[in-house]
Amino acid sequence: MGYEPDPDALRWGLHDLEVCTLTNAGSCSSVTRYESGGGGTQGYVREGYNQPVTGYVDNDAVIAQFYQDELSRVARAEASGINSLSPTSVVAQDWPHPHQGQENQGEAIDITQESDILHNHNGNMEDKNVARIRFEGGQSSPSRDDDSVCSVEIEEESWSEVGKRLNQMIPIAHVPKINGELPSEDEQISDHERLFQRLQLYGLVENKIEGDGNCQFRSLSDQLYRSPEHHNFVREQVVNQLAYNREIYEGYVPMAYNDYLKAMKRNGEWGDHVTLQAAADLFGVRMFVITSFKDTCYIEILPHFQKSNRLICLSFWAEVHYNSIYPEGELPIPEGKKKKKYWVF
């Protein structure tokens, strides 16, 4: 079976992530899969690590040169009309709009539904060796007003080079958790330097997000709407996703679920990997989170049902801060700095 490269993955250079060799403390590429246990609501996580492959280059300079050559090749392909994807077309998705109305959430609705075996959109069982973040459970929220329902059209799935490489990963058992303890000051400094080097290696830059406790939701807002200012709307939508589909997420929250929802409603409450999964499920998009972990270069989060081929890309300074990331030269222009448009008479 042939695979067409995912245009977004090429644009981001994500098809090269497997060769990241910034640390010798383990593999630099990891994805985690949440699988259903026997009870329907409980689950466990399997995390995969890339094994060393003989013949891959070790030298960071060589890797960086390879990446630059790849970018040049993609640019030539785009110039010749092979790839018609433009930054405008990437942004032009039919996401829920921040101005749309939303019903009062109220108490979380308890929907009882047994988990099914994971299938892809063609109905085929997925490769168990591909470790991906995905919670089991119900399919969608109860019927609500049309304005509050995601209207992103489901597109034909296109597996990227990253997806093909992830098939070679060997999963290991792992326990899901929400935010952990903050690292020490020294660890924070070294983690930040490691994250910076990884972003620099792959030609990615951070859109610096305000550190007010809303950084995850601001980063998601920036990726979805090209502005971090719609973070309250994104938080509201994510909390609704968690509330209306509690059977999917409750097993991964080590506290009373209603207390967790009340906390997540509050402005300034830190998001975690449960809210990231809920956001991926809500918008139906894949997420790539470049991390500062020693043994994990990136995490891929897959939605329960993919509705778009678009990628959401974040950086995660582990347990400290999220930023929105872009390829060099593609940072969105802040609202106040956009060029004025004049009518020509």
UniProtKB/Swiss-Prot annotation:
Stretches assigned to the OTU domain: 204-328
Reactions catalysed: Thiol-dependent hydrolysis of ester, thioester, amide, peptide and isopeptide bonds formed by the C-terminal Gly of ubiquitin (a 76-residue protein attached to proteins as an intracellular targeting signal)
InterPro entries: OTU_dom, Papain-like_cys_pep_sf, Peptidase_C85-like
Active site, UniProt feature: 212, 215 (nucleophile), 321
Entry-linked Pfam families: OTU
Keywords: Hydrolase, Ubl conjugation pathway
Top-level taxon of origin: Eukaryota
Protein family according to the UniProt entry: Belongs to the peptidase C85 family.
Name of this chain's protein: OVARIAN TUMOR DOMAIN-containing deubiquitinating enzyme 9
Record organism: Arabidopsis thaliana (Mouse-ear cress)
